[in-house]
């Protein structure tokens, strides 16, 4: 005869298996988000080769088996970190890209304003999320490994801006022969700016922020400011030169 104090087997709580998160952790994405946040910081500082799953688990305060429950391999976690920063970047920049696309056919001051807003929005985003710069710089140290990350999380956004510039050129509102190089020049300059901020003193940071934004405005105004299309200038274009695109981005 079973004692009244005993709990019937079918009413006992199920035991938590090894590596499974606790019930409180299963109720929301907090553990996964903490893993991604800490992993992004470590990958940005050390690169994937210098970061182990054990390092990440220790930063989060869980064991490796619990980390494996969310990400079965380091490659999956590394990819998810890029997906996370890309989602944040797209959320910040998508409205600005849409404004640029609408202004492409108009040209003049609306296009110049949209370009400046997009460039400054990109710089603002990187300053607020510097790990984005260092995550990508670590990736680009090896030009061939991880090219799939570029295709998934960098080239689509670059391509949208390139196509907007190409549409503006085809509409005759700007003269643009090298949108591919123009976009990447701004991207690399912005990442270099964030790198300079990381090593600067407070006073140097203020100067860097001011001068870099001033340079961005001068760069864009020189290429795409009002009247540039009529003047025949813009990204190295000469009178009668055609728009040249060697490879458009899908």
Regions flagged by a language model, labelled:
Residues 2-18, 124, 128, 158-171, ...:
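C-terminal peripheral helix-coil segments that are non-catalytic and often amphipathic
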Residues 90, 94, 113, 128, ...:
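Amphipathic alpha-helical packing segments from all-alpha helical-bundle domains
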Residues 31-34, 38, 42-76, 80:
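Helix-turn-helix
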Residues 48-49, 145, 174:
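Conserved hydrophobic residue
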Residues 71, 138-144:
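Short helix-capping/turn signature of helix-turn-helix
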Residues 80, 94-129, 180-186:
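Hydrophobic alpha-helical connector segments
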Residues 34, 113, 117, 135, ...:
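Amphipathic alpha-helical interaction segments
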Residues 83-89, 97:
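Short, basic, alpha-helical segments at the C-terminal edge of helix-turn-helix-like DNA-binding modules
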């Amino acid at each position: 005869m079973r004692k009244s104090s005993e709990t019937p087997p079918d009413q006992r709580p199920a035991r938590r298996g090894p590596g499974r998160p606790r019930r409180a952790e299963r109720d929301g994405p907090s553990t996964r988000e903490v893993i991604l946040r800490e992993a992004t910081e470590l990958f940005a500082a050390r690169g994937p080769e210098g970061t182990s799953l054990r390092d990440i688990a220790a930063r989060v305060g869980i064991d490796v088996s619990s980390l494996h429950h969310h990400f079965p391999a380091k490659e999956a976690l590394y990819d998810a970190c890029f997906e996370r920063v890309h989602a944040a970047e797209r959320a910040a920049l998508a409205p600005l890209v849409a404004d640029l696309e609408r202004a492409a056919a108009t040209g003049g001051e609306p296009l110049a304003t949209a370009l400046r807003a997009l460039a400054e929005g990109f710089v603002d985003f990187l300053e607020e999320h510097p790990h984005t710069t260092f995550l990508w710089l670590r990736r680009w140290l090896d030009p061939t490994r991880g090219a799939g990350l570029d295709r998934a999380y960098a080239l689509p956004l670059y391509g949208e801006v390139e196509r907007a510039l190409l549409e503006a050129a085809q509409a005759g509102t700007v003269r643009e022969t090298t949108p591919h190089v123009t976009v990447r020049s701004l991207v690399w300059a912005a990442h270099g700016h964030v790198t300079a901020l990381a090593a600067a003193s407070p006073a140097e940071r203020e100067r860097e922020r001011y001068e870099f934004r001033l340079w961005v405005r001068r760069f864009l105004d020189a290429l795409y400011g009002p009247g540039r299309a009529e003047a025949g200038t813009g990204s190295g274009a000469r009178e009668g030169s055609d728009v040249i695109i060697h490879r458009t981005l899908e």
